[in-house]
């Protein structure tokens, strides 16, 4: 190779190699620090678009929908079951009130218990309210729908049930009393029909709640699969990166030494003119 004081090609090549080593070391250190193989879109655009968060499916989980967490955890079904239990207790009071041999005091005591159970029933219905909606008291104008796919093209619908007093399911009223055997007999007839209808309504709510819960489970598993797939694309292999870093740490001083040697090459020209 010709020696020249104007152009030092070996030094330029050595500098390029050293710069490349420094860039590689910076890239390796970034991957180690972030844990990601892809840190910017310019690295690999197609893979960068799948970085964590880009394909998040959590929006489909029913727990992220208003009120759905309360439904699939059983608030609606549990409230309905409580209504059914209260109706059974009321039935015991009504059956006892049909006894014609009861004293007035005993009958009044039974009626007081009956009225207290009606108040408890209303309280249970009010407790089924969440996020401004109530599944059981008939105050909600329309059924509740929840997003079921990423394109918002499908929904899971929860059919509401009206278990409030004086409705089509619960025909009891707040003014009912069991102060005499005749009233008690009439209340018992409506109460038996109400109990059957309430149990059916609660069963429907439970079935739909299971559907929502199953959807939650499916979305959670799907999210895990997506997260694993994305991780395979963007996560850095730290074992490999550690090996690369050690190699570059050796390569970097060697490159600096090569550049130093190349920079000193023009000095050889001076020796050609000495001792003449």
Curated annotation (Swiss-Prot):
It comes from the Bacteria. This is Flagellin FljJ. In C.crescentus, the flagellar filament is composed of multiple flagellins of 29 kDa; 27 kDa and 25 kDa. Its main location: secreted. Belongs to the bacterial flagellin family. GO terms for cellular component: bacterial-type flagellum; extracellular region. Pfam families: Flagellin_C (PF00700), Flagellin_N (PF00669). Keywords: Bacterial flagellum, Secreted. Residues 51-80 are annotated as: Disordered. Signal peptide: none annotated. GO terms for molecular function: structural molecule activity. The gene is fljJ. It is found in: Secreted; Bacterial flagellum. The lineage of its organism: Bacteria, Pseudomonadati, Pseudomonadota, Alphaproteobacteria, Caulobacterales. Flagellin is the subunit protein which polymerizes to form the filaments of bacterial flagella. Residues 61-75 have a biased composition (Basic and acidic residues).
């Amino acid at each position: 190779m010709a020696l020249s004081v104007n152009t030092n090609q070996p030094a330029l090549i050595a500098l390029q190699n050293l710069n490349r080593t420094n860039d590689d070391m910076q890239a390796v250190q970034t991957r180690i620090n972030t844990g990601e193989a892809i840190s910017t879109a310019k690295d690999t655009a197609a893979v960068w678009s799948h970085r964590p968060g880009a394909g998040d499916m959590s929006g489909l989980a029913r727990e992220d929908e208003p009120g759905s967490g309360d439904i699939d955890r059983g608030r609606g079904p549990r409230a309905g079951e409580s209504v059914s239990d209260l109706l059974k207790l009321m039935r015991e009071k009504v059956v006892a009130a049909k006894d014609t041999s009861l004293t007035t005091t005993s009958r009044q005591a039974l009626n007081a218990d009956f009225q207290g159970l009606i108040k408890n029933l209303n309280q249970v219905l009010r407790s089924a309210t969440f996020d401004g909606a109530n599944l059981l008291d008939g105050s909600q104008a329309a059924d509740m729908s929840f997003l079921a796919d990423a394109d918002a093209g499908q929904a899971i619908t929860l059919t509401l049930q009206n278990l409030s007093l004086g409705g089509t399911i619960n025909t009891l009223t707040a003014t009912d009393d069991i102060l005499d055997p005749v009233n008690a007999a009439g209340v018992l007839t409506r109460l038996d029909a109400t109990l059957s209808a309430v149990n059916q309504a609660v069963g429907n709510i439970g079935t739909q709640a299971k559907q929502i819960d199953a959807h939650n489970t499916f979305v959670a598993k799907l999210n895990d699969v997506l997260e694993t797939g994305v991780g395979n694309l963007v996560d850095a292999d730290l074992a490999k990166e550690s090996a690369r870093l050690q190699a570059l740490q050796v390569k970097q001083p060697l490159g600096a030494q090569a550049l130093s040697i190349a920079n000193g090459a023009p000095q050889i020209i001076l020796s050609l003119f000495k001792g003449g």
